[in-house]
């Protein structure tokens, strides 16, 4: 044990009735990013995930497959663990409810609650959902008797069972939730749970006799413990409640249980009431995240829209998947999964903004300084000095904003802060123009300062982005010529950390650009409208020759795209605001929406016809034209590495 503050975070333990889908990947990526962040922020972290392996559904699945339940779960749990490895999940423990350590804890706590008088024998007659492993009282159902959580038909069951006195603790639960408003998050989930309890809390069936795959009730072995009393206890088992009292003393209570919104009820009502009965401190927070949806619908096998993460990981890599999920989905809300948006995000944020910044920064260090960094001196040039001071200030401000976002469970806000800084570094290149400084030996200290600021800024980015893109972050760190990445933390993020004389190690592009065109076997299922085959393009006729004087009438400039958005009711048009330097901006409308996502254009430098007469397109005045090349139905915009306003000759 050490003196660091502790942080205990858990995912749900996933049910091995089938392969995991992208929604499970989302949940575990969130938890992993928080665990990594807390480690970098100086905490002793215990990060738990696992598998919930008992219950009637598993028993039935195993029987259908002609194997024993443990043989059935062993195979699928192995797939879980392989997925987490490929996703680069940094869990400290993986608990299985079939492990002996867990069986011992469940039986001990069941006995304790029984001895207290909070568990009694009775007969259960009512409605049961096999897939969800949940009982439903009549007052929570509609006339169709379908599961309120999953929508499947419920089974009417009648059997001897043990019951847990949930109703006894309803008032105490309500008082606790009112006095601890941060216990259930986000607030919308808290309000839902309060209304659920206000509508009436019935005692909970906590044992079954109609199947045998489960942990035996210690004083009545013909009963097995109901799966939720079994599963929820895993958080105590892994924390060492029986086997490691020092560990348990340090890490319990859990700081956060991260769960999908469909199991918030079990974690925020059943679980805390169980702990009240057992005399164990409640977790500090339960956070219920939203669902990932595809084509506007929740994923389900019956709809054929379940997204398998394995092909995506193989095609795009874990960092790209993690970044997209955590950046594009507002935590706590449902979010739509889109392959096109994933590719757009890779191209715009990871390839263009981050990857190109690192590559061109290190290329200039290699070209102008033979790969060696020196801090230099920017004081001799007012523009460079001011821009450099702004980067130093923004680095500290970004770290503060990033930490605030992560601590506030606003991961996408934290990432936006980091990528705003990345774009500021890209802008810094345009303002300071290191290629121009390199032409004048007298400006060598200025060039050194600019190159150092770019690399030191990337050092900040590397550590801040590590919770979300850990593989790329370590590559950035190593390419900057730094070592001991595993032991770095946020205390190291003080400006000036790269020592004079550091040799950079430029590598290949971090995130190669992905072409938008997709094959028919794309791993993300979606509804696709059949397109008519394209008509063969006619060979273009040669244009009439023009004089050199006519050509020079065209004023071609480099323009930086500041904003970009699709034009409403148009499939082809994107509206952009571009900068021509010296504070001059223009609005331009371009027919490139079929080939580029708006977000991947922002920050790009393009060739712009600046003296074209304005024309209205879809009611928007377009004040120029962006040049593009087309052939055989494809189109590409040439991007250039020159400052905005540069004349094209």
Question: How does the language model describe each region?
Answer:
Residues 123-125, 141-144:
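Short metal-coordination and nucleic-acid-contact micro-motifs, chiefly zinc-binding Cys/His arrays
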Residues 136, 154:
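Cys/His-rich microdomains that often coordinate metals
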Residues 530-649:
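Phosphate-backbone binding interfaces of nucleic-acid-interacting proteins
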Residues 72-128:
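A broadly conserved sequence feature marking short terminus-proximal activation segments
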Residues 112, 128, 135, 146, ...:
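The −1 position to Zn-ligating cysteines in a subset of zinc-ribbon hairpins
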Residues 121, 127, 328, 333, ...:
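Helix-rich, typically C-terminal accessory recognition domains appended to large enzymatic cores
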Residues 476-550:
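Intrinsic disorder at enzyme termini
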Residues 2-49, 96, 101-105, 131, ...:
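Structured secondary-structure scaffolds
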């Amino acid at each position: 044990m050490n003196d660091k503050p502790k942080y205990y975070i858990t995912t749900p333990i996933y049910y091995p009735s089938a392969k995991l889908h992208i929604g499970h990947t989302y949940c575990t990526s969130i938890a992993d990013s928080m665990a990594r962040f807390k480690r970098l922020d100086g905490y002793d972290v215990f990060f738990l995930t696992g598998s919930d392996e008992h219950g009637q559904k598993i028993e039935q699945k195993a029987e259908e497959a002609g194997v024993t339940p443990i043989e059935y779960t062993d195979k699928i749990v192995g797939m879980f663990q392989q997925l987490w490895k490929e996703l680069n999940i940094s869990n400290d423990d993986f608990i299985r409810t079939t492990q002996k350590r867990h069986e011992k804890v469940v039986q001990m706590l069941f006995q304790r609650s029984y001895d207290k008088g909070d568990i009694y024998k009775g007969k259960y007659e009512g409605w049961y959902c096999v897939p969800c492993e949940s009982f439903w009282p009549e007052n929570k159902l509609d006339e169709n008797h379908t599961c309120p959580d999953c929508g499947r038909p419920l089974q009417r069951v009648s059997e001897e069972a043990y019951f847990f006195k949930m109703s006894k603790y309803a008032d105490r639960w309500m008082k606790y939730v009112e006095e601890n408003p941060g216990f259930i998050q986000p607030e919308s989930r808290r309000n839902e749970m309060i209304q659920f309890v206000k509508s009436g809390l019935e005692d909970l069936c906590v044992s079954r006799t109609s199947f045998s795959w489960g942990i035996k009730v210690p004083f009545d072995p013909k009963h097995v413990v109901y799966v939720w009393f079994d599963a929820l206890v895993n958080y105590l088992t892994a924390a060492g409640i029986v086997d490691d009292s020092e560990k348990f003393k340090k890490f319990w209570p859990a700081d956060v249980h991260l769960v999908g919104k469909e199991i918030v009820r079990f974690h925020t009502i059943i679980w805390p009431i169980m702990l009240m009965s057992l005399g164990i401190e409640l977790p500090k927070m339960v956070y219920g995240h939203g669902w990932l949806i595809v084509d506007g619908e929740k994923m389900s096998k019956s709809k054929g829209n379940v997204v398998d993460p394995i092909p995506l990981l193989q095609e795009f890599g874990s960092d790209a998947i993690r970044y997209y999920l955590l950046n594009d989905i507002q935590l706590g809300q449902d979010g739509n999964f889109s392959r096109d948006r994933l590719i757009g995000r890779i191209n715009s944020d990871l390839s263009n903004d981050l990857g190109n910044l690192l590559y061109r920064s290190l290329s200039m260090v290699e070209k102008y300084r033979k790969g060696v960094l020196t801090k230099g001196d920017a004081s001799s040039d007012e523009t460079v000095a001011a821009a450099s001071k702004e980067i130093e200030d923004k680095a500290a401000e970004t770290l503060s904003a990033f930490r605030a976002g992560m601590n506030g469970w606003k991961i996408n806000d934290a990432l936006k802060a980091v990528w705003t800084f990345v774009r500021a570094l890209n802008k810094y290149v345009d303002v300071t123009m290191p290629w121009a400084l390199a032409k004048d030996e007298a400006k060598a200290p200025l060039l050194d300062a600019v190159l150092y600021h770019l690399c030191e800024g990337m050092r900040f980015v590397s550590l801040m982005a590590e919770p979300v893109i850990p593989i790329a972050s370590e590559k950035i760190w190593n390419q900057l010529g730094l070592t001991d990445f595993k032991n770095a933390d946020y205390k190291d993020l003080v400006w000036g950390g790269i020592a004079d004389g550091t040799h950079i190690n430029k590598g290949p592009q971090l995130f190669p650009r992905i072409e938008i065109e997709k094959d028919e076997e794309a791993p993300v299922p979606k509804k696709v409208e059949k397109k008519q085959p394209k008509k063969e393009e006619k060979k273009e006729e040669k244009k009439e020759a023009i004089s050199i004087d006519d050509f020079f009438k065209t004023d071609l400039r480099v323009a930086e795209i500041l904003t970009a958005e699709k034009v409403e009711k148009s499939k082809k048009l994107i509206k952009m605001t571009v900068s021509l330097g010296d504070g001059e901006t223009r609005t331009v409308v371009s027919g490139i929406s079929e080939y580029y996502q708006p977000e991947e254009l922002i920050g790009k430098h393009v060739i712009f016809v600046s003296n074209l007469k304005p024309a209205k397109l879809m009611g928007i005045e377009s004040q120029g034209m962006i040049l593009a090349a087309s052939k055989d139905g494809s189109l590409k915009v040439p991007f250039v590495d020159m400052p905005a306003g540069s004349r094209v000759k």
